[in-house]
Amino acid sequence: MGEKKSSSAGKSLAVRKSRHKNCLSEIPPTPDNEAIGIIASLSPPFARRQTIMNNLSHAIDALIAYAREKLGLSSRNAVYARNTVLGLVGAQSYEDSGAVYDGREVSDLLSDLVNACAEAGLPAAEQPERLTDGVMGALMLSPEAVEEAFAAHMRVSSAEATRWLYDYCVHADYVKKKKLDANPRFTAENGLIVTINCAKPEFRDPKKAASGNSVRGGYPACTICRENEGFVGRNKCTLRTVSLELGGEPWFWQFSPYGYFHEHGIAVNQKHIPMHVDRDTFVRLMQFVDLFPHYFIGCNAPLPRIGGSVLAHDHYQGGGEVLPLHRAPIAVPLSHPDFPEIRAGVIDWQGTAVRLSGKNADQIADLSERVRVAWCAYEDAARGLIPVDGDGVHHAVSPTVIKTQNGYEMNLILRSNITSAQYPDGVFHAHPEFHVIKKESIGLIEAQGLFILPGRLVHELADLEALLISGAPLPEQYADYAMLFAEMKAMSPAFTPQSAHEAVKTELASVCSRILKNTAVFEAPSDTAQFLIRKAGFTYGK
């Protein structure tokens, strides 16, 4: 009987050996020395698989804990959210890791998730942006819940409401604040703000830059339609918008993921209609600052080369930063006999801009419309100012508004997109000698003195600094910088690392100022004043 038991035990062990080769999860506990040896030989791959699963579970749990802390995820919805994330990553198993929020930034937590998915061989890791956008969208409040929370904050103050929404979008990783904070930025002595946007692609080809101007159909119709909210195809699962009413019509507000300034966002018409500027535009802009007096708001000129990249859909840009144009003084005071309550003047500015100030919104809208109509019909062939020709309309106004203790301050920037044989990209655009710094359209934000320069400049300007320090000649690859490099070299007989860096910053600010001057449709403020007096009925003021 004893021998039979021994034989049976041997067969049982043999069966266990066979099973162990194919199913690591079925290893039973046993004191048998041979079985222990088998387990020991199999433990490295088993432990590796267990580690991979633990890493993935930990990454998911850390994000759930983060969402509980920062995104308003309730305990009731936590399990549902976790299962949704498991489905998004394609995981087949999960073990509670007990992870808690440790204070790290969401971008780091998402990197952990992508790395864990890659380690586990999950296909979701091959599209990291889509994966992270989908995961964060699943952890966020719904659009309706965000709208309700925003409305609750609005009952306290509009500043609190926009601050809450902006912070929420940062926490959700829709606004890429970590990347934005890494962008080089400085305020120059001439008052201009210069930034290098490393997160934004450069469109040196105007046709490519204008790709957002035409409607190609499909769904959503363009990149800023409200139907993008939650749309996976454009990685908009984390987009959240809030409703506005402007001019008695439905609009909405959303923050820009790659903003150029503090709390940069856009107000978008609910209807997909082309950009345009008329009296109603001025009214809506002032209504916006009535709602959000801590913001400025403006509208790009609705024409290619001097407007934004999405002219097919009516929208405005604004945010919580006072831009250089808003700080600029009046060079030529003006008044208008039909609007005695409105203070007016030509702004002391490199471009061509007019300021109208007062507390009566209707009067400011009326006078703004007079300026717009006068400018859009103005012709001066000697200066190349042609309002309309066979290529279409060329004159437009870019309005921008802030609210002060004196009421509304409407700044009207006069623009022209006319071209010529000498200036095929635009007579009143950055001239060719400056294209190495900025060739893209000079839109609303730059026209107000905040320049967004391409990311390639980080490395190119660092190379120029090194050349200044060493005294080496400009290599052929940087031939386009010849004029600017000569101007930098003329600033000092010799350069230290610090003085070379300052020389580059000084040159950048000078170039940006000259580009703004290129956009000026009149040579001097006095010329602008004469236009307003002759064509729009203004008189000289005090």
Model-based region annotation:
Residues 239-242, 270-297:
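Helical scaffold of the NTase/Pol beta-like nucleotidyltransferase catalytic core
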Residues 12-14, 18, 27, 33:
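Intrinsic disorder/low-complexity segments enriched in small, polar and charged residues
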Residues 280, 289-309, 318-372, 376-379:
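Catalytic or ion-translocation cores adjacent to nucleophile or general acid/base/metal-coordination motifs
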Residues 49-267, 271-274, 350, 364-365, ...:
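Active-site microenvironments that recognize anionic phosphate/pyrophosphate groups
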Residues 28-35, 39-43:
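Intrinsically disordered, low-complexity segments enriched in serine/proline and basic residues
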